[in-house]
Amino acid sequence: MFRNQYDGDVTVWSPQGRLHQVEYAVEAMKQGSATVGIKSETHAVIVALKRAQNDLSSHQKKVYEIDTHAGVSIAGLLSDGRILARYLQTECSSWRWDYKQAVPIKKLAESMQLKLQANTQYYGRRPFGVGILIAGYDKDGAHIIQTDPSAEVVSMHGTSIGARSQSARTYLERNVDNFEKSTPEQLIVHALLALRDTLPAEENLNAQNTSIGIVGKDSPFSLLEDAQVAVHLNQVSTHPRTTGGAAAAAAPGGAEPMQM
Amino acid sequence: SSIGTGYDLAASTFSPDGRIFQVEYAQKAVDNAGTMIAIRGKNGVVVVADKLISSKLYTDNANPRMFNVNDNVGVAVAGNYPDGFALKNYAYGEAMKWLKDYREPMPIQNIANSVAEYIHIHTLGISRPFGAGAFFMSWNKQTGGRLFLVEPSGLNYEYKAWAVGKHRQAAKAEIEKLKIEELDVNQLVKEAARIIMVVRDENKDKNVQIEMGWVGEQTNGKYEEVPSEVVTAAEEWAIAKLDEDDMDD
């Protein structure tokens, strides 16, 4: 039933020095709908694509505020992601209690990395099947932090994780030089254009399936309302769609019930 | 070989010929990672790592491999990055505890020993061994430069110079050609950059970046990241030197 002898448990090294269970957890993250994060000098933006189980159900929440200066978005097993979001909320508030100030994003990223790493080493646990993007603003400026189940935690100018996220990363790599000086509005447009590239041609972004979170200098983290999301989507709709990119990297399977 | 016979699935299992395969496999994670070299010279220690930068979306100095354990001791982790980060965190915590208890900085030998013990516990079979190793380095007037390497097996040796990772054999051969005891830290930085570049596989090692750390007389015994302009200068020197050598051939 196993693909090889060395993939039954996280606590087993393969002869090549790889951890198969951890690599499989990364695959779980890749099945979740995509999320994109980018930053300028002054702001960090996260946008996410939400899935609904069916026409009658609501869309699953993917973006959480974790403190006034930071928020996260999730791709992968959303229930795992919620646990991590809650963990980060607790980290933020306990830092505030200890130091009477907001936690630096770097410290948040470090504690996140240690928590994720423990789940790749100790028996009886599994890695989190989820990747998250942390958007934050602190005295060092704006930050986008990317995490994945293998506990790779890295600071980025912009990035995307989740299904067909390669298409979004291609967009970001082409435009990364423009982000630094972008206004918050331009940043949101870039993020939405990148996110739209992860969609198959017959689907499109709308106010219901799109989440936008933004944080920056003198502006606390805010998760935009549907009406505000629609305004930003209007700006995006005038840009022609780049076709082909999304289809090339089509993810396997449809919408799994757990992974959204 | 005994691979696949079932004796290699847990660190708690010896193979019939007395080997612990899980520990050997964990070592592979270090062997397959980017090359890292550490050299002790006349008046300090230099460490250099070759890092893969897989995308231009990474910020500058994302995922540093070198850290301070305390003001005087540096650590450089090689292998699986998250495992290395956890080791660095443990070392930092131990140094902090020592400082609280004894009101003086934890000596490098004690740091290396305590991390080695921690790594060793993970080779007994309750959890998987660490897929990372760590260099520790320091310098002061009394002891001069000191350099330790702790491996995934929990072994802890002091070195004059050593290399781990993908191109360690070639790197060690290059180090042996130098009279490292006679080189000061500024020369070491250049030679270390040259060695990292010369052992690279031109076809495979693309999008790589050099990261360096040093401790010595000129840093007043403090471990520090090597400033980026010094790294750049060392790389330029190395490229010129390599071109020169090519001309001679």
From Swiss-Prot, chain A:
Gene Ontology CC annotation, any one: cytoplasm
CDD domains registered for this protein in UniProt: proteasome_alpha_type_1
Positions of region (Disordered): 240-260
Xref: SUPFAM superfamilies: N-terminal nucleophile aminohydrolases (Ntn hydrolases)
Compartments where located: Cytoplasm; Nucleus
Biased composition (Low complexity): 244-260
Cysteine disulfide links: none
The UniProt record lists the keyword Nucleus: yes
Top-level taxonomic group: Eukaryota
Protein keywords: Cytoplasm, Nucleus, Proteasome
Parts of the chain that traverse the membrane: none
Any coiled-coil regions, as ranges: none
InterPro entries: Ntn_hydrolases_N (IPR029055), Proteasome_alpha (IPR050115), Proteasome_alpha-type (IPR023332), Proteasome_alpha1 (IPR035144), Proteasome_asu_N (IPR000426), Proteasome_sua/b (IPR001353)
Biological process annotations from GO: proteasome-mediated ubiquitin-dependent protein catabolic process
Pfam family, one: Proteasome
Principal localisation: cytoplasm
Quaternary structure, from the entry: The 26S proteasome consists of a 20S proteasome core and two 19S regulatory subunits. The 20S proteasome core is composed of 28 subunits that are arranged in four stacked rings, resulting in a barrel-shaped structure. The two end rings are each formed by seven alpha subunits, and the two central rings are each formed by seven beta subunits. The catalytic chamber with the active sites is on the inside of the barrel.
Primary role: The proteasome is a multicatalytic proteinase complex which is characterized by its ability to cleave peptides with Arg, Phe, Tyr, Leu, and Glu adjacent to the leaving group at neutral or slightly basic pH. The proteasome has an ATP-dependent proteolytic activity.
Protein name stated in the entry: Proteasome subunit alpha type-1
